């Protein structure tokens, strides 16, 4: 027997959540594997990316329509709908707001559960490839110029806000 296996998408409740895991970034020029710690409280996101040996590569914060990328003292600010201007990513419009809902298994505005494990928005294609009891565990976000793969190691769901801390 062969065929497709349907994944049941269990959405993470809105509010305060975080996860830790691995992020694979692939472009035509490079391939990197980073550790990721993503903290979300309502509309505020804080993402810490670390490279080999746990060295912090970047902190990304999205709050009130602004995206702030801190790469070890080099801080760049974007409006949420701005295109990225970093080397290698010129003109690339990343769906930051939508992504914070998609990784939880929700539609773009967070109100409804995704009806499929796949979402297409512009040139971006998001897919949940594995789910667990706590929520999505493996996901991909693809664009003709870049492919991101996310593997969640641990979800933490909370009803109350807590400061960013190590999982």
Outline where the language-model segments fall.
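Residue-level detector of beta-strand face positions
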Residues: 24, 48, 66-68, 118, ...
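Beta-strand-dominated lipid-handling architectures at cellular/organellar boundaries
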Residues: 16-20, 39-41, 59-61, 66-68, ...
């Amino acid at each position: 027997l062969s065929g497709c296996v349907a994944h049941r998408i269990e959405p993470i409740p809105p509010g305060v959540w975080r996860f830790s895991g691995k992020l694979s970034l692939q472009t035509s020029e490079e391939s990197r594997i980073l550790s990721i710690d993503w903290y979300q409280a309502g509309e505020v996101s804080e993402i810490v990316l670390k490279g080999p040996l746990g060295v912090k590569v970047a902190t990304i914060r999205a709050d009130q329509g602004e995206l702030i990328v801190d790469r070890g003292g080099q801080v760049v600010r974007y409006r949420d709908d701005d295109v990225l201007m970093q080397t290698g990513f010129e003109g690339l419009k990343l769906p930051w707001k939508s992504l914070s809902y998609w990784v939880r298994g929700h539609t773009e505005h967070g109100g409804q559960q995704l009806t499929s494990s796949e979402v297409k928005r512009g040139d971006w294609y998001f897919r949940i490839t594995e789910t667990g009891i706590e929520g999505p565990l493996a996901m991909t976000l693809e664009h003709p110029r870049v492919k991101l793969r996310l593997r969640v190691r641990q979800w933490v769901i909370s009803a109350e806000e807590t400061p960013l801390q190590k999982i």
